[in-house]
Amino acid sequence: MASLNVNIAKDTKISETVIKNIHALVLMNRPDDKGVYRKIPVTIMGAYTEPVQPYMIKPKITELLIKNEKRKKKMHAIERIARFHLEFEGIHPFIDGNGRCGRLLLNFELIQNGYPAINVKFTDRKNTTKPSMSSIKITLHSR
């Protein structure tokens, strides 16, 4: 994926438009799919949960955005950003590019909150992401 330099305004909130615009950049070579929520059910190999049905994507994204704003007052930024990322990936709103879009959204929030962007190399993802996501899910569900 091409690198992307963006000046992130402090007051820019993640919105459905921002999510779809970031996704459009991720899938710029697939005009029919870029920035468009999926219209078919999907399953993710090795996932513990199934993504929401297509008709629930928009309401779930709206709910996630509202929760994210409320959490800004209650949670440490890192915990809030991690939860947002986990829940976004669980919704799996697009037919392709969810992981890339989710990582860009995660970095958008990190930078906006004064943290450096992160990059998990593709070769490291298999070894770090699955165990980390499993422990995060266990932690979130035990609260």
Question: Model-found features: residue ranges?
Answer:
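FIC/Doc superfamily catalytic core
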Residues: M1-D96, R100-R143
